[in-house]
Amino acid sequence: MKLTDYVKQVSLEDFGRPFIHHVQWNRRLRSTGGRFFPKDGHLDFNPKVYQELGLDVFRKIVRHELCHYHLYFQGKGYQHKDRDFKELLKAVDGLRFVPSLPNSNSKPLKLYRCQSCQQRYQRKRRIDTKRYRCGLCRGKLLLINQPED
């Protein structure tokens, strides 16, 4: 899919206005589907959203960013808090928030247990069991499950 052509097509079909600036993929975007840059008018999109959530969701994200784009160049309120933005987004059926991506928070938890009092600890990061002990009874910690990395 040619991204620039697709965004121009969505702009004409859903807004009736041309899109004349630059569009690009940005793999560094993590928690957002796209970004609008008022300074030069270009748009960035997250390729993972397109790959993992499909074209229907991606089209709604393109509409969201085009709402920012067209309202900014019309001199209207283009920020999320503005009424103009909310009304236009509703009219074109754009997404307000990106659905969470699968595997976005998939870091497995490590489970430790105190050998004395059986207190359990879940951690994202590894604990040095030679250096750290249980916070309740000062007993030794034991790694129960080692997830595959």
Curated annotation (Swiss-Prot):
Biological source species: Streptococcus pneumoniae (strain JJA)
Keyword Metal-binding: yes
Name the UniProt record assigns to this protein: Protein SprT-like
Keyword Endoplasmic reticulum on entry: no
GO cellular component, as recorded: cytoplasm
InterPro entries the UniProt entry points to: SprT-like_domain (IPR006640), SprT_Zn_ribbon (IPR035240), Uncharacterised_SprT-like (IPR023524)
Domain SprT-like intervals: 4-143
Subcellular location per the Swiss-Prot or TrEMBL entry: Cytoplasm
Active site: 65
Family the UniProt entry places it in: Belongs to the SprT family.
Pfam family, one: SprT-like
GO biological process: response to stress
Cofactor note (record): Binds 1 zinc ion.
Keywords: Cytoplasm, Metal-binding, Zinc
Highest taxon listed in the record's lineage: Bacteria
Cofactor(s) required for function per UniProt: Zn(2+)
Binding site for Zn(2+): 64, 68
GO molecular function annotations of the record: zinc ion binding
